[in-house]
Structures are given as structure tokens and as C-alpha cells.
Amino acid sequence: MRIAIYGLGYVGLTGAICLASEGHEVVGVDVSEDKVRRIMAGSSPIKEPGLDKMLADALAKGRLRCTIDAADPVRSVEISIVCVGTPSAPDGAHNMRDIAEVTRQIASAAHSIGRKDKLTVVYRSTIRPGTIDGLILPILASSLGDAAGVIDVVYNPEFLRESTAVKDFFHPPKIVVGTHDGKPSAPVEEMNRNLDAPVFTVGYREAEFTKFVDNSFHALKVAYANEVGRMCVTLGIDVKVVHKIFISDTKLNISPYYLRPGGPFGGSCLPKDVRALQHISNDIGANTHVIDALMRSNDAHKHFLYSRAVQGLPPGAKVLMLGLAFKSDTDDLRESPNIDLARKLIQGGYALSIYDPSLKAEHLIGQNLGYAFSHLPKLPDMLVSKEVAENESFDVVIDANGAARELSLKSANVLDFHAL
């Protein structure tokens, strides 16, 4: 394929050289004359294992050339890949100046030459969700008018790590392709055909957000690990032993579990132990800001779900909650976030009914009994049978524990809080 790469930094240059090594004809575009000159002389401006040899090979075989002229490749290439930087602005947002400028340059060149063949423009820079719809497509429409359809925009984020970028290019953890209709892009499929990785073809906004989710989670893991490390060092605990034990658990710790957006955490263990760990941290002055934020974040999610539940709902409306325990298939109500939600609904003046197949008020004992009735004194009166849950009309049904899938509900307005 004939491919242009805009922006020859770590991502762009690595991509250009790797694509050239696969036999594609690649044109690299960058605003820096010095960078272009160095690359064409066979000297990589970035330090990346294996890249110098691959660059020399690509130049020797005539598969890579570089230019400062953004319009140069537009006449002949099938794909243009945008890898320009999106540095932080003073307010923390991404500075989109270079994204906008490259988009204008590509569109202007396509307009000037009267390009008729479809050009796929692939964005790999990290961009805020909504950027393609709110910035890129309007620029194309303004520059090309009725001919804007000649350019097909795709978002295909990169997952390269500096120092292992070449390996990561050929062995990505996944391939994410964002298109206007969530359907595959044939040119991008052809470009990626040698890559063996799970492929997710989605809409623009989902693809745009993926990179933020990934990078923030990586940062979260590093910050959490370092907080644990600080506590271990201060307490005289061997952090390497703790780390080894932690990562050995691939069923829960290093796994997909607890990563599905849904209900807040609760129950008799997590809230109690998080608070206790916060207390230990405060005692020893470990400054564990990530751990300290856990309960606040959980409370914020509880508020979010309540606000979502009552949006547009008048006081007195009939509400059915499916599930009251902190998770399904248990009757443990201790620190259940669903208890908090039920209490707020009652305080808000809503007519609340609750169906939980695992819960019988007369069977509650001990702390479970005390917690339930201290928060919901009229709990027995609110519990309804499966028949009532299925056959009575409710203004809204809140599925807190995933019970809706086992019921034939008459009410159609069901909010899934078990899995957002």
C-alpha cells in the first residue's frame, strides 16, 4: 500500500519504518527540516532498539522517503496516518492545534488536486472523545464542501511503549478501529493484516476514549503499587514478597474481575478494610492519595446512580429495586450500596418496592439484621414477591443486582445499575 505518516516522533517514525519493512511504500511528513534530513541520511532522531537497522533497510529498498511538504503525498497515497503531538495545554487539556493544522493541510491538498479516489485518513494521536465529530469532520466539511466524502476518517489509536515500540508495533495487545458507523475499514484492515491481535471495530467516541482509559489505568497501577511500596518500607515489610503474592493471584487481582463498570463496592469487607488501610497510612504518614480517594470515589458513584435513577421522575413515582444485598446470591446487607440507594429514594418521596430473591426479612440475624433495620426500618413492608415484581406496573425498575434477566417484567423502563 501507499501510506503517508504525518508526524515523525516516536509513534510516527516507528510506524513509518515498521510499515516500510512490511513492503509498503511510505512517505513521512514532518515540519522539522533537520529531522527529515537526518532520517533520509539514515540516522534515526529517536533512540529505539532495532530502529536504525530497519531504517537503513527501508531507505536502501526505496520504501521510505520523507518530506516537509504536507501536500506532497496526498495525490498518490491510499492512507494518511496522523501521528502529530497533542501536548498538554496550561489547563491540562490536549492542545489540538497540530491536529487541526494537519487536517486542514490534507483537506486543502485534496481540494487543490481535485482528488476523486477515496483517501482514508487515520488518526493515531490521543484525542478527546468527540474530537473527530466536533473538530476534524467540520474542518473537512469546511475545506472540501460537497467533496468532503472523498476522505474517510478512521481513529486507530496506537499502543506503543518507548524502548519496546518496534516489538509493540508488530505484536499489539489489541487493535481498535473507530469509524463513523462502527463498521470495518477495508484499507485499515489491509494495512493491519499481518498483525495478530484482537480487533475491536467501534464508533469514533468509543475508540477515542479507549486510549485515555488504558493510560490512566496504567498510571493508576503504578501509583497504587508505589503507595503500597511506601507503606511496606515504612512498616518494615518486605515489599518484594508482598508484590510476589499479589501478582500470583490471576483469578482476582490480575484479571478482568472488578473492572466492569456497574454498582459501587460494598459488603462487610471492602469498605471496612479500605478505611482501616487509610488509618494505617495516616498513622505512618505514607500520603496514600490513591487509597485515600477510594471511599470518596465510591460515594460519588452512589450519587451518580441515584441522580440517574430519579432523573425526570416526579416524587411519588413507583420504583422497583431488584436486589438489596451488596451483590447477587447473598443476603448480606452490611454496607450494601443498594441500602444507601433505597434510603435516598425513600427520602426523596418515591414509592419504593424491593425484590431480592435471596432476601427474607425474617431470616436476618446479628449485624446483618441490625444494619438493615437501622437504615430501612420498614424493610418488611417494602419487600415484594416475584409475581408482584413481574406483573405490577412501575414507573422505573432499578436492576441493582442483575436480577432483571431472570424476570419477565411488565415495566419497560429498566435501568441496569449492575452493569452500566
Annotate each predicted stretch with a short phrase.
Residues M1-L420:
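Structural/interface elements that position substrates and couple domains in central-metabolism enzymes
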